[in-house]
Regions:
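Short amphipathic beta-strand/extended segments with alternating polar/hydrophobic composition
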Residues: 11-16, 101-107, 144-148
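Structured, beta-strand-rich domain cores
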Residues: 41-105
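Acidic surface patches and DE-rich sequence motifs
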Residues: 4, 95, 137
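Solvent-exposed edge beta-strands and adjacent loop segments
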Residues: 1-63, 109-124
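Mixed-charge, glycine-accented linear interaction segment located at domain edges/termini
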Residues: 108-172
C-alpha cells in the first residue's frame, strides 16, 4: 500500500514481485596505538528499497509527478518539471520462515526515473523496477516491522496497511 504526501488514504499495490531493502549503518572505531580497540555500529535512519512490481496507473502518475494542468486530460509527461513527492509504503510479506510480517517505510522518495521494458508478443506484462530512498521519520527510524504472531493488538494488525502512523505503533 502507498500513500503520497498530502493524501489521506493508502492505495492498494498488492502485485509486488520482489522487495529488497538495505538499511544504512555507520561504524565508529576507537584506536589506541594504531590498533582497533573497539567498534560500534549504529543505524543511520536511512536506506534504500528496490521494488519489482505492477503499479496502478494513477499511483504511477502521482509518484513520478507526471500530471500537468496545461496538458489535455489523459496526457501525462515526465521531465524537468517532475518533482518526485514523498510517500509512505506499507507491506504484508512472508519472511524466510513463512511467518507473516508487517513492514512500514514512513518516509520514502523515488531515487530513479521511470524505467519500463515493453516486449511485443510477451506472455506476461513486465514488472516495474523502482529504486526508493528511505529517510528517517521524526523518531529517527526509516523502517518499522512486526511479526503478526507477536502482535497483541488487533487494531495494529487491522490498521497497519491502510492507516500506519507512529501513533498506531507507540507503546500504550
Amino acid at each position: 500500500h502507498i500513500k503520497v504526501a498530502g493524501e489521506d488514504t493508502y492505495e492498494d499495490m498488492n502485485c509486488v514481485g520482489s522487495s529488497e531493502e538495505e538499511l544504512a549503518v555507520r561504524t565508529i572505531t576507537k584506536k589506541c596505538r594504531g590498533r582497533i580497540r573497539k567498534k560500534r555500529t549504529r543505524g543511520t535512519g536511512d536506506g534504500a528499497l528496490k521494488e519489482s512490481l505492477h503499479v496502478p496507473r494513477t499511483v504511477y502518475n502521482k509518484i513520478y509527478d507526471m500530471t500537468r494542468e496545461k496538458l489535455a486530460k489523459g496526457v501525462y509527461a515526465y521531465g524537468e518539471n517532475s518533482k518526485h513527492p514523498e510517500f509512505s509504503l506499507t507491506q504484508k510479506v512472508l519472511d524466510e520462515d513463512e511467518n507473516v510480517k508487517y513492514k512500514a517505510y514512513p518516509r520514502c522518495i523515488l531515487s530513479s526515473g521511470p524505467s519500463r521494458k515493453i516486449e511485443n508478443g510477451a506472455e506476461e506484462v513486465a514488472e516495474l523496477e523502482m529504486t526508493i530512498d528511505l529517510m528517517p521519520d521524526e523518531n529517527g527510524e526509516c523502517m518499522y516491522e512486526a511479526l503478526e504472531s507477536e502482535l497483541e493488538s488487533e487494531e495494529i494488525k487491522q490498521q497497519w496497511l491502510t492507516n500506519f502512523s507512529l501513533e498506531l505503533v507507540k507503546a500504550v
